[in-house]
Swiss-Prot record:
SUPFAM superfamilies: Ribokinase-like. ATP binds at residues 116, 161. This is Hydroxyethylthiazole kinase. Belongs to the Thz kinase family. It comes from the Bacteria. GO terms for molecular function: ATP binding; hydroxyethylthiazole kinase activity; magnesium ion binding. Keywords: ATP-binding, Kinase, Magnesium, Metal-binding, Nucleotide-binding, Thiamine biosynthesis, Transferase. It comes from Staphylococcus carnosus (strain TM300).
């Protein structure tokens, strides 16, 4: 492990979050607990001031509207122009033609550093016939194949989330198997992960696969610890313990507990 978590705790990188209305509070609190500095900025008018000093930018389309379309594209354009790392989260992209059309257009105009989504979302980016319900992952999909095809099409790092997470970068593929079933029972779990990934980028527009492994593992191992601390009482208790676990987790715990399989 690169121990970038230690760097986050000492440098408190600024993560610009243009995220959806449902998860803003949860995302900000999660980043603060981790040690990062969130700013929930959406105005392109201030992007030229914020982005050059930011560690990364997250764009999450969860509550996409016509108003957000323009602002997201403008902000993403400025991120590319200022060489600020960009995490793109195409939430529920397969749920409607509107979302899919926007994401396809966005990815033609913009170069993300990382695309993060579940299997159904990543599949929808590479298969025009794919559909989905809400933000839930589809079952019985070849997640490694989907992630590799998305990587080849968009030439950017792919983080495909699910019961087993798949990361593709620099033609390397790994599977990660940490996490908690409670993550599927709280809203915004995947959305916060996108922001956490951003916290690990530190203005690196081509992060190593090791960096991405650490980011996802910190998140998932914190979730495992939260489940243990909450004594499986339920999602509400887990949610509180998860924020605490992000605050408490350290690099040694991540290195010791990371459940990783190198696919290629």
């Amino acid at each position: 492990m690169n121990k970038i978590l230690d760097q986050i705790r000492t440098e408190h990188p600024l993560v610009i979050c243009y995220t959806n209305d449902v998860v803003k509070n949860f995302t900000a609190n999660g980043l603060l607990s981790l040690g990062a500095s969130p700013t929930m900025s959406e105005a392109p008018q201030e992007a030229e001031d914020f982005y050059p000093v930011a560690g990364s930018v997250l764009i999450n389309i969860g509550t996409l509207t016509k108003h957000h379309e323009h602002a997201m594209l403008e902000n993403a354009k400025i991120a590319n122009e200022t060489e600020t790392p960009l995490v793109f989260d195409p939430v529920a992209v397969g749920a409607s033609k509107y979302r899919k059309d926007f994401c396809k257009y966005f990815l033609k105009k913009i170069k993300p550093t990382v695309i993060k989504g579940n299997a159904s979302e990543i599949l929808a980016l590479i298969d025009d016939t794919a559909t989905m319900k809400g933000t839930d992952s589809a079952d019985n999909l070849d997640v490694v194949d989907i992630a590799e095809k998305a990587y080849k099409e968009y030439q950017t790092a792919i983080i495909l989330t699910g019961e087993t997470d798949v990361i593709v970068q620099d033609n390397k593929v790994v599977k990660l198997s940490n996490g908690s079933h409670f993550l599927a029972k709280i809203t915004g779990a995947g959305c916060l992960l996108g922001a956490v990934v951003g916290a690990f980028l530190f203005r690196n527009t081509h992060p190593s696969i090791e960096t991405l492994i650490e980011a996802v593992s910190v998140y998932n191992i914190a979730a495992e610890r939260a489940e243990q601390l909450s004594d499986s009482k339920g999602p509400g208790t887990f949610l509180t313990q998860f924020i605490d676990a992000l605050y408490r987790i350290d690099s040694d715990a991540v290195a010791e507990n990371c459940n990783l399989e190198e696919v290629k």
